[in-house]
């Protein structure tokens, strides 16, 4: 009967050494991956507001549980959605220390397009849609204030088109909660009489065929008068001008060569503007 071959101690030791080395490398990769994870939580949150389920994409730095944290709301335009708005603008990368909220609108009749209300959007005036979106804003902010340490002197809102008109509505009806606002591709002269001085940024596309640049420049002139802004302004960034204010409410006007869009080139400017404003 043949003897079984004796195990090769040298080969066994080499196998064990290699196996151990692979294990160590794997553990190192995993630990580095875990260390590289941002100290944040992000995802979709839901609330029931007056019987209707509402949702938003929210980015929350973990430091918000212990440190006063600014909050920025970003509202999509008519027919838009929270996913595209969140991923296209990546405010959380530009301001990782802030809470970023991108709510989802509901089916809403538009003023310039979609009069039937087959696409998502926001209420246009006080009392419209039973003020569902004003209540939604209040609910989100209230829940964040319960769960996080919100810096109430640094709450900001920005939006595009119909979402920017809703920003104007928030300015008119939630002014005491807001430090500053930024509107892209919007105009609503009917709300002007309801506004109090507030730091504001207006983003205008020279090629906007839906909300005419002339309409938006009319808003700019009204905002400058409301905020008692100086003339002429000073450069804020490329294509952007800042106007100082006698009442502490400066204005920035960014005129880009594009059309009816919230351009990615505006993102850093909006965040820079917001970072420089704190409500007294």
Describe the function of each predicted region:
Residues 20-31:
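Bacterial N-terminal signal peptides
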Residues 125-148:
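Alpha/beta-hydrolase active-site loop
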Residues 64-112, 209-213:
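Short substrate-entry loop that stabilizes the transition state in hydrolases
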Residues 32-71, 83-84, 89-90, 98, ...:
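A domain-start/cap signature at the N-terminus of enzymes
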Residues 104-132:
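Cap/lid segment of the alpha/beta-hydrolase catalytic domain
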Residues 150-160:
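Alpha/beta-hydrolase fold nucleophile elbow
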Residues 202-204:
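Short beta-strand/loop motif that positions the catalytic acidic residue
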Residues 207-211, 260-261:
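Acidic catalytic loop of the alpha/beta-hydrolase fold
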């Amino acid at each position: 009967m043949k003897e079984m071959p004796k195990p090769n101690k040298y080969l066994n030791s080499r196998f064990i050494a290699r196996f151990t080395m692979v294990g160590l490398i794997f553990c190192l990769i995993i630990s580095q991956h875990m260390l590289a994870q941002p100290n944040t939580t992000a995802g979709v949150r839901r609330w029931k507001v007056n019987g209707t389920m509402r949702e938003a994409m929210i980015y929350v730095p973990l430091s918000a549980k212990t440190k006063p944290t600014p909050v920025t709301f970003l509202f999509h335009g008519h027919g838009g959605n929270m996913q595209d708005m969140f991923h296209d603008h990546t405010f959380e990368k530009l301001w990782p220390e802030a809470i970023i909220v991108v709510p989802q609108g509901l089916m809403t009749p538009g003023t310039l397009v979609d009069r039937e209300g087959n696409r998502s959007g926001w209420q246009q005036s006080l009392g419209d849609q039973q003020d569902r979106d004003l209540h939604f804003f209040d609910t989100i902010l209230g829940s964040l204030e319960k769960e996080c340490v919100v810096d109430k002197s640094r709450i900001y809102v920005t939006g595009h088109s119909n979402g920017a008109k809703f920003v104007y509505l928030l300015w008119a009806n939630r002014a005491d909660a807001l430090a500053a606002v930024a509107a892209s591709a919007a105009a609503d002269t009917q709300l002007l009489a309801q506004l109090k001085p507030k730091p504001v940024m207006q983003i205008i596309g020279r090629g906007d065929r839906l909300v005419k640049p002339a309409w938006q420049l009319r808003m700019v002139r009204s905002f400058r008068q409301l905020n008692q802004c100086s003339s002429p302004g000073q450069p804020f960034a490329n294509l952007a001008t800042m106007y100082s204010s006698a009442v502490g409410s400066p204005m920035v006007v960014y005129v880009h060569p594009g059309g009816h869009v919230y351009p990615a080139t505006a993102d850093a400017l909006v965040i820079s503007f917001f970072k420089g404003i704190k409500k007294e």
